[in-house]
């Protein structure tokens, strides 16, 4: 018997069906409509986590993301902006995080395009614990100078950072139980380290004067959650200690004043042999007012850099950042094309100095003792404080601080450094060696090591009683002495047998220790 077909009311909405086989076109449309409604609701709730679709770029991108996703437990739909520096393939510009060196496999967010180095993937809790806001492009990599601001425990911001891609805004208790046995122990230890770091603000902190570094999570010179392996420094991948999330990363302002990140003096190497000073100035004038200089320029009176390199002295620090943004990065180095009368578009190396590389504290719990500090002369200018600290610590151990001497005006390295030790044995071993071979990357140089001499110390023998309370002008660097002496006490002590050949070190004004007819024994 043929029954009349009942037409559904036009105004009645279709009820989504959770499980139905599309045996008819009408049911298939209902299934598609239900799926579209679910996707629309999911995207509207978690709009900053776009669904992963088939990439129109190339297949190797999908495979690259798939590998990284599987290492985190195959959680699909994760925001790729939250996975910076956590095993995602790519290359980070160690000097200018804002600059996009080359098109990589990672599709970066449109606001701050950057790539990050490939490191070992971390667990899902370690990946998300550094997420500091609900909808942010901020990447928090494994950099020492990142200005991390963790929300209070139990806050919505920290909990939202652990949400799954399905749109859960709170930690699912059932799911958290599943991860308790795997990650909660390490998370608890990490949080304890964080609280200790907050109570001990100098523990592992770099000597960086900006207030944005108040919450650095560095313990013993390393991140409490993401330990840096020494091989990263050996391979030249660690940028110490760097700077991706420092307050100056985006040319930020604090209290209405712009924060400087780089020295206004920039090294330029590999210049064409026939380029003169005016042509160098013309090549870089578009970045801002500058002066071209090179060693012994005034004495030589030459218009051509004699060794193919020069220094650019910019009037404003912002010009240096503009120059960096215009460069091309290759193998961790910056290049810019410069033309001369006979050579067109020759790539020259641009080597800026990051101010944050001038100091490195490996262990802030140890007090800095100037009598356990050495002076290192002839330090290559590309060498950073973190690299100097690692080299000395591998040789002698007990390093708690390293610094690179910079000139007060341009804040550019002067070719000398300081290293403080936590124990007398390491200090004596270093000064007894007299010379150290600094090897790091392209750097391989023999440098001189001396005790670090101060000009405000009293005589260790008479405590100023025989010299009218004046500071001691002499320091004996022989391991049998290692003391400051006034003129009277020096003559008295070193007239004894076995000490007549000791020679003093002095420090004049703001100069570094200078040797006076010194002979090591």
Swiss-Prot record:
Organism for this UniProt entry: Mus musculus (Mouse)
Keyword flag Iron: no
Cellular localisation: Cytoplasm
Domain of life from the UniProt record: Eukaryota
Biased composition (Low complexity): 12-35
Tissues in which the UniProt entry reports expression: Expressed in embryo, cerebellum, salivary gland, thymus, heart, liver, lung, spleen, kidney, intestine, ovary and round spermatids. Weakly expressed in granular cells of dentate gyrus and the pyramidal cells of CA3 and CA1 of the hippocampus.
Ranges of residues in domain RRM: 264-355, 372-454
Keyword Repeat: yes
Protein name: Cytoplasmic polyadenylation element-binding protein 2
GO aspect biological process, one term: negative regulation of translational elongation
Biased composition regions of type Pro residues, renumbered to the chain: 1-11
Gene name, Swiss-Prot/TrEMBL: Cpeb2
InterPro entries: CEBP_ZZ (IPR032296), CEBP_ZZ_sf (IPR038446), CPEB (IPR034819), Nucleotide-bd_a/b_plait_sf (IPR012677), RBD_domain_sf (IPR035979), RRM_dom (IPR000504)
Organismal lineage: Eukaryota, Metazoa, Chordata, Craniata, Vertebrata
Compositional bias of kind Polar residues: 55-70
Pfam families referenced in this protein's UniProt entry, alphabetically: CEBP_ZZ, RRM_7
GO molecular function list: GTPase inhibitor activity; mRNA 3'-UTR AU-rich region binding; mRNA regulatory element binding translation repressor activity; poly-pyrimidine tract binding; ribosomal large subunit binding; ribosomal small subunit binding; ribosome binding
Region ranges (Disordered): 1-35, 50-88
Function: May play a role in translational regulation of stored mRNAs in transcriptionally inactive haploid spermatids. Binds to poly(U) RNA oligomers. Required for cell cycle progression, specifically for the transition from metaphase to anaphase.
Subunit details: Interacts with TENT2/GLD2.
Protein family membership: Belongs to the RRM CPEB family.
Keywords: Cytoplasm, Phosphoprotein, Repeat, RNA-binding, Translation regulation
Cross-referenced PROSITE patterns: RRM
Induction details: Not induced by kainate.
GO cellular component: cytoplasm; glutamatergic synapse; nucleus; ribosome
PTM annotation (Phosphoserine): residues: 21
